[in-house]
Design a protein with these regions (language model features):
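Catalytic nucleophile serine of serine hydrolases
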Residues: 112
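Extended, subdomain-level signal for the structured scaffold at the beginning of enzyme domains
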Residues: 1-104, 108, 116-128, 136-193
């Protein structure tokens, strides 16, 4: 992948129970494309991943959510895992953090259960998305359309279903984030009302 994200900083919002591959592989792809990534979490030191059916590895938190300024980031990555977004969506600071990216027309990528945060942030209406199948009703009830596809890009948001989709997810995430970077984040995303 070309280094089209050089000089850009991407927030990765996660907490304990994130799906290991859905954080680590996109993080690596972003860094290979030239971006600086920062893991942002309500937990201050380390968060523990979930690796398919058991606990995975710990990942260092770069900045605590309470200290993170979303204005300092060019884009947002929301990994899945059932526990991770389920906890984050109940955290008002995490929801505000996500809303900022839509209010400021910045691109967002969410995989698997990650789109739960988009539902909570009121950012689904008018978009077509994919996700882990159990989120289909939540997305539709929030005003979005849901499709069972490997990856969907809709109005500044990239979504995918599961870890098997990571290669396509990474490709489209890098393409969207690069396009936004080239445009100076010039309104690629619909603002949240």
């Amino acid at each position: 992948m070309p280094n089209s994200l050089h000089g850009k900083t991407i927030a990765i919002l996660a907490t304990d129970g994130f799906e290991q591959s859905e954080l680590m592989k996109p993080k690596q792809a972003l860094e290979e494309a030239g971006a600086k990534t920062q893991v942002v979490s309500p937990t201050e030191k380390k968060i523990k991943g979930w690796d398919h059916k058991d606990w995975g590895k710990e990942v260092a938190v770069d900045i605590a959510l309470k200290s993170a300024d979303p204005a300092q980031y060019d884009a947002l990555l929301l990994p899945g895992g059932v526990m991770n977004p389920d906890q984050l969506r109940m955290n008002p600071d995490a929801v505000r953090f996500v809303k900022h990216f839509f209010e400021q027309a910045k691109p967002v990528a969410a995989i698997c259960h990650g789109p739960w945060m988009l539902v909570e942030a009121g950012a689904v209406r008018g978009r077509t998305m994919t996700s882990w199948p159990s989120l289909k009703t939540d997305i539709r009830n929030a005003g979005g359309s849901w499709a069972d596809e490997e990856v969907i890009v809709s109005n500044g948001v990239v979504t995918s279903r599961n870890p098997d989709d990571i290669p396509a997810f990474n490709r489209e995430m890098i393409a969207l984030f690069s396009k936004a970077a080239a445009a100076g984040n010039g309104k690629p995303v619909q603002k949240v009302a």
